[in-house]
């Protein structure tokens, strides 16, 4: 399998997963998937950067929602950088958001574990450098917003840790 794919392929894969989950949980949540802008479609990205974050949002962000759950994916281009926003209306606390931000900074959570989110953050930083990676904040919907930050083009780096 390739380590890098076009963003359009990565989005297609993630959206297939999201549609399956949307049909499973249709009674208790809505999943809104924006169309990938044309200028972002050919960007090369590391594989599996979106689907695991969707899975996290469904399991941890919205897992306890009995009804009216919302998960939304949107895109933005600003100053030569590209952003993918994954937002939910889960009931995350400010303390948990802060712990998530700290684990990205430290490269491990408080238990010393490297989570899928940390792995994605590291791979994005390796590939793009600079300001690339994940950002975590409060969503406009009240839950968590995880933003994937991409630079214009990445560099071809070999993967040493395929853990």
Language model segments and positions:
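Two-component histidine phosphotransfer core
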Residues: 1-137, 141-145, 149
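Gram-positive cell-envelope targeting signals
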Residues: 155-163
């Amino acid at each position: 399998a390739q380590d890098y794919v076009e963003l359009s392929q990565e989005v297609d894969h993630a959206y297939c997963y999201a549609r399956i989950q949307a049909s499973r949980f249709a009674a208790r949540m809505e999943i809104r998937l924006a169309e990938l802008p044309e200028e972002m479609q050919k960007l090369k990205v590391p594989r599996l950067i979106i689907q695991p974050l969707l899975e996290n949002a469904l399991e941890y962000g919205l897992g306890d929602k009995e009804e009216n759950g919302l998960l939304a994916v949107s895109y933005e281009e600003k100053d030569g950088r590209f952003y993918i926003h994954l937002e939910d209306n889960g009931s995350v606390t400010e303390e948990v958001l802060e712990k998530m931000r700290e684990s990205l900074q430290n490269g491990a959570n408080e238990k010393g574990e490297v989570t899928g989110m940390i792995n994605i953050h590291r791979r994005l930083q390796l590939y793009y450098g600079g300001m690339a990676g994940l950002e975590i904040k409060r969503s406009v919907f009240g839950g968590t917003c995880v933003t994937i930050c991409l630079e214009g083009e990445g560099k071809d780096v070999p993967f040493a840790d395929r853990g």
